[in-house]
Amino acid sequence: MIICGFPGTGKSMMAKFSRWVDLESTPFKKNWLLYAEVAKHMSDNGYNVMISTHKEVLDALEQIEASYTVVIPPITDKATYLHRYDMRGNTYDFIRLLDENWERWINAIVEKPTALKTIVVLPKDGCVKAFADEFGKENR
């Protein structure tokens, strides 16, 4: 199972306390196709994988025909998430980037229909853990 989690939805925390893998994108140095291929390979081999929601990552998953679920916060929960980014120590530039692009990025995910993608909108103040546990059970 591949879950693409919007920033702040709890990917890293989930991986610390469960059998999910948080596949960090940084080592791939923007080689999004390789990142998607590694996630798909891990998923095909029984791992539950969480990755980022960068547009290029979602496009790469489509390119390799990998099924995936995107977990996003409610678009109205922006202030909660900006506070969450601050509390977890993200940089001012990161927080500003999310603040300036919040609506555009979430809308881009929702407005691009595809047969390979399932979208889950978290409840207010929610995190990916509750949904990831259920997704993982379905794919064992």
Residue spans for each PLM region:
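Conserved phosphate-donor/acceptor-positioning beta-strand/loop module used by diverse small-molecule
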Residues: 52, 64-85
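Conserved beta-strand scaffold positions in the cores of enzyme catalytic domains, especially
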Residues: 20-22, 68-70, 117-120
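Short His-Asn-centered micro-motif
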Residues: 3-6, 23-25, 49-54, 72-74
